[in-house]
Structure formats: C-alpha cells, structure tokens
C-alpha cells in the first residue's frame, strides 16, 4: 500500500497518475482536513472505474490507517505563495514535517519516505531526524522535477524531444540549484556542445525560475510536474526498478559532504537509495556545487532544534 500524506493539488495529482500507471492496488490519502481526503478518494475511485483500473483509493484523517504501508509520500505543508521564498517557509513546515515524521515512525516504521515539502532539502533533513530512519529510506523529491524542466527548456532550444535528453541538476532545490549542461547529454553529446553560451544561460535561468514562474502566472505552485515525478519515483520503489534519477538525499561523504541532504544522482529501488552516483565535476562546477551546499547548510542551521528530535 502507498500512503500519501497531504490531499492538496500535488498529493491528488500524484495519486491520480500512480493509479493510471497501476503502481499499486491501494492508495491511501491522509489529511488533517475533515472530508478532504475522503472526497478526493471518492472522486479518484470514480476515475478508476471509468478508466477500468484495478486501483482502490481510500481517504482518512487518522495516521494509524497508514499501518502496513511500504511507501509513504509526504506532500503536506504550508504552500508557497507568490513572492515567497522557500526560506520563509522553514519554521512552519519544519513543525509539520517533524510531526508527520513521528507518526510515520510509529505506524509505518519499515517504509520508504519520499517528501515534497519546501524548502525541500531542509525538510528532508527534518524528516531524517524525526523518523530516525537510515538515510537510504528518506528521500527528498526535487531532482526529477528540476531535471525534467531542464530537459524541457533545452529540448525547446534544440527542436528535439525532451525524452532524448539525460539531464543532471545538482545542489539545492531552490534558487541556488545547479543545472550541469556539461554532464547533461543527448545521445552522448553534452548540452554544452550543442547550445551556445547564451542559450545555455537562458536554459539554466528558465530551469531555476520555472517554479516561481508557475506560481506567478496562476497564483499557486506546480502540481502536475511534481505529481508525475512522484509517480516515477514510486514506480521505481514499488517495482524495484532501480532507476537512476536525481533526488535530495543525506550524503555520507559523497561529493565531500557529510550529514546534509543534497540533490544528486541516485539509484532508487524497493529499499530506497541503492547507490549515490558521484559524477566528476570541473573546478568551476565544483565551486558552484559547494556554494549550493552551503546555502543548504545555512538553511538547515535555522531549523529549531525541537523539530529535529
């Protein structure tokens, strides 16, 4: 069973796409708002019937119903508003994530946890601390979305399908994220060889600002992109597909970083992170990566200690 904590736009989009992909036969939605997860589950069950899917959705306001879940996806949290930075969300969402982490530890102690709550890397740290789980089972969703956006904007410049691009984005999920064109390939040819410096600069800028642009245009943050990315990650866990993808995970010496969640390439399977993939960076790329790491470290340092226990 998959449990999704948070029945807002991202959680329900993820639930719908997971059902369409037939990733699991039962998907539980949990939310603190009475009636919300139940209503979303009923609507999704109607969708399932119309599409002929063998998927059952259930809604609940009680964390104990997640018992038996092998995958818990956390999308709950205070939403990002227009003009708001991820950093402004820290204290409010740290409490939410810490509380949810304790419930997961109690009712689904063997689960793999994937979360989307912003600021993503800092909240991954809170979840890691509050659950006490090994780092392999606490994964921040970010890189699949960031890499997808990089592929989308680069493909538009090149006039090719985004599926032809193998994108790499490192560092922080946020304003200091670090797309790496020299390690992002189109059938073995790096983007840095296919695009001019001006084009690369535009692609990187569009990738970094994509989330804020969506929020500015429609008044609330993205949900379909994150929903699709979560479904891809869930599929890799549930089927033990061992896909290589980008995610925020606590590093234990990789890239010279210790005990800090950073967006890096990983292999994802049924036990969570199977392997962290280290790619060789140029001195300039390493400097940018380190700057992004320091931005994460600074943000983590602002988290109240009471939420890290």
UniProtKB/Swiss-Prot annotation:
Keywords: NAD, Oxidoreductase, Tricarboxylic acid cycle. NAD(+) binds at residues 6-11, 31, 93, 116-118. It catalyses: (S)-malate + NAD(+) = oxaloacetate + NADH + H(+). InterPro entries: L-lactate/malate_DH, Lactate/malate_DH_C, Lactate/malate_DH_N, Lactate_DH/Glyco_Ohase_4_C, Malate_DH_type3, NAD(P)-bd_dom_sf. One of its GO terms (molecular function) is L-lactate dehydrogenase activity. The active site is at 173 (proton acceptor). Its EC number is 1.1.1.37. Substrate binds at residues 80, 86, 118, 149. GO terms for biological process: lactate metabolic process; tricarboxylic acid cycle. It is an enzyme of class 1 (oxidoreductase). Catalyzes the reversible oxidation of malate to oxaloacetate. Belongs to the LDH/MDH superfamily. NCBIfam families: PRK06223.1 (NF004863). This is Malate dehydrogenase. It comes from Pyrobaculum calidifontis (strain DSM 21063 / JCM 11548 / VA1).
